[in-house]
Amino acid sequence: GNLRRQFRVDIQATQSGDRLILEENFLYDDGEQDRRVWQIDSQIIDGRTHYSGQAADITGKAIGKIAGNAMRWSYDISLILSGIELEVRFDDFIYQMTPDIAINRAYVSKWGMDIGSVTLVFLKDRLAEEKLPLDLKNW
C-alpha cells in the first residue's frame, strides 16, 4: 500500500484511583494536530486481566487483553478522512520489545474488510525526549 500520512504522538499517563488516564497529543506531517483522552479500567476475569476503555471519538468501549509481552486492543472509532466521517474498526497488536520500546501494528477495517494499517514505535521517557521531540521543525 501507499504511505498516506505520518504522525508523532506524545502520550502522558496518570492514575486516578483504579482508572488509567492516557492523554494522546498527535502531530501530523502536514501540521494538523489532534488529541484523544482515554479512560481505561481493568478487571480480573478467570485469573486474567482484561481492559476496557473509552474516549470521545470511540463508539462503545475498547476491549484489551494481555498475553505475555503482547496486548490486543480493539475498538470502533469515528475518523474524518478527506472531509468525510467514517466509522472504522481498529485492532491493535502491541508488543513490548524492551522496558522502553514497544511496537504497535494496527489493522483498520470497515464492514470486516481490511482497509489499511498503522505501524507505531513507542519510545518511553528519556528515549523519546532524546530522539523525537514533538515538533515539526525536527520532522
Where are the model-predicted features located?
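Central antiparallel beta-sheet cores of small beta-barrel/beta-sandwich binding domains
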Residues: 2-81, 93
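Beta-sandwich strand segments
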Residues: 2-4, 86, 114-117
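Short, charge- and proline-biased low-complexity linear segments
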Residues: 8, 12, 88, 108-110
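Short, well-ordered, mixed-charge alpha-helical segments that flank or form enzyme active sites
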Residues: 81-82, 113
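Helix-driven interaction modules
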Residues: 82-84, 98
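Glycine-rich, aromatic-bearing surface loops/beta-hairpins
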Residues: 91-139
